Amino acid sequence: MKKNLFLVSVFASLFVGTANNALAYPMYAQQGYENPREATGRIVCANCHLAQKPVDIEVPQAVLPDSVFEAVVKIPYNQEVKQVLGNGKKGGLNVGAVLILPDGFTMAPADRMSAELKEKVGKLYFQPYSEDKQNILIVGPVPGKKYSEMTFPLLSPDPATNKKVNYLTYPIYLGGNRGRGQVYPDGSKSNNTVYNAAAAGKIAAINPTEKGTDVVIDKVDGGSVTVAIPSGPDLLVSVGDTVAADQPITNNPNVGGFGQGETEIVLQNPARLQGLVIFLGFVLIAQVFLVLKKKQFEKVQLSEMNF
């Protein structure tokens, strides 16, 4: 329990905004959701990462039971861009991913991984989403420049020992992000998003603060309202400007985003493969006999013609 609380506090500090780390995806999904994939198919990380970006996943077409294989996850982005960090400065993007495997599929244990696979995995640390969801793996945040492509070491189940698993085609779901989110789990905005005018009116004052800027708007219907803007977004308005309600008064500094992908994998029955090999062997033998029989028949015809 103490270890879990420590992990939560560590990743919470990453979210709130140290200068060197990005939004602590996907740890916040762990804290707030029993399952990261909603009934609609939407992965909950999209609640905080509002921009849509592509992701890609590559797995074998089929695997045998109780075998180690790899899933290659790609989270592409322009590695020349910088994002707004929690303190308002600019820095590199981090990436994170959640891989939702079929029930029974898990992360491969180290003693089952080949030296080549270990080299591909590198220093990435994967962990199950929860104790009862060993088939859902999460990783990150990690530096995007080094890990925009990740290799997940996976282990397929064996229906002979796990009666809940069958030889079928199964879906695999991926969620991947690059960069910090725009909304915190409590619904409040981060400093990595656009800020809008709280009411229609005129910009009366722009006051620098310790954490950013306060923009005071004299409302059309009287009174005033203050929009607190944290360090990060750039102001688009000046004192004296007229603004409409919900009009953007800052740029959108977000350069990252979240994406979902899916693929399929077949848990192949070895007996079926053996049967297929035997069948193909019989077909090959039959073809050979047909060729030999045809040649024999041609020889007989030729000899009769010569006679």
Swiss-Prot record:
Residues of the signal peptide: 1-24
* Record's keyword terms, sorted: Chloroplast, Electron transport, Heme, Iron, Membrane, Metal-binding, Photosynthesis, Plastid, Signal, Thylakoid, Transmembrane, Transmembrane helix, Transport
Q: Classify the protein's membrane topology as the record does.
A: Single-pass membrane protein
Please give the Pfam families that the UniProt record associates with this protein: Apocytochr_F_C, Apocytochr_F_N
State one molecular function term (GO).
electron transfer activity
TM ranges are 273-293
GO CC list: chloroplast thylakoid membrane
Biological process per Gene Ontology, one example term? photosynthesis
Q: Give the note describing cofactor binding and stoichiometry.
A: Binds 1 heme group covalently.
Intracellular or extracellular location(s): Plastid, Chloroplast thylakoid membrane
Q: Which domain of life is it from?
A: Eukaryota
Has the keyword Heme been applied to this entry?
yes
- Subunit comment for this entry? The 4 large subunits of the cytochrome b6-f complex are cytochrome b6, subunit IV (17 kDa polypeptide, petD), cytochrome f and the Rieske protein, while the 4 small subunits are PetG, PetL, PetM and PetN. The complex functions as a dimer.
Family to which the UniProt record says this protein belongs? Belongs to the cytochrome f family.
Record's protein name: Cytochrome f
Gene from which the chain derives: petA
